Amino acid sequence: MRVTPLISTALVLAVSGSLFAQEWVEFASRDDRFTCNFPVQPKVTEIIYRSQHEADLPARVYSATQGQSRYSVTVVDYNQAQRILTEKAKSCPKGAETCLGAVGDEGHWKADIRGAMDYASWQLMKRDAKLTLFVWGVVDLVEGRQMQLTNADKSRTFAGIYMHENKLYIIEGTVPAGYPEPGLFQQSLGWLDENGVSIRYQTYYSNGFPPPPRARRAPAAQSPGRIDAPGAVVNPVQR
């Protein structure tokens, strides 16, 4: 007789969890070549992001809220770093190596790109928060940094920082004290190619090095959680 209430409770929890998941939006950006789940359609804000070597780079922030929880993906286009820092180096004082850079690395644009993830990590560490985790990690085999911080108001921020095709991705989910970590948000980040098609690599991807071969696409029913951008056309070779 005691089994029935337990089964009913389990069913209620399962249905509630399913309904909660269904409320989230599977978002895809062809412009910034990523996919991610948000609680609602994210707001898109264009900003300027100043890099370590002071290049003012174009960036977008995709943000959404659910109650007291906040979610965002910031995408910074480091493909512009070479042009911006090379031009900036032309006006550097004579002999100012930290500004001039070197031949082929004017304005230290190469270092700016290579150090982008660490610089972004440092910006998070400087917040009024206690760092509780800082590790190397991957999302769909694209390497990056993963962080957890406890903020001054006891809320917790779960962050991931990744670099793909010279674009920096800073993903942050902040939840009130006592709330579970935002796994539905964190684990949904994915990558798109130039045609808006979801991609995954066969082994680790490190920005700045030749990309590894891509994994063969499994049928949709076998690879849940990864979507293509609207209107994407999948090449038969990718299937």
What is the predicted function of each stretch?
Residues 28-30, 39, 45, 65, ...:
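A structural detector for beta-sheet-dominated domains
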Residues 19-24:
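Boundary at the C-terminal end of the N-terminal hydrophobic targeting segment
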Residues 1-10:
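Bacterial N-terminal signal peptides that target proteins for export
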Residues 50-160, 228-239:
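Conserved polar/disulfide-associated segments of primarily extracytoplasmic proteins
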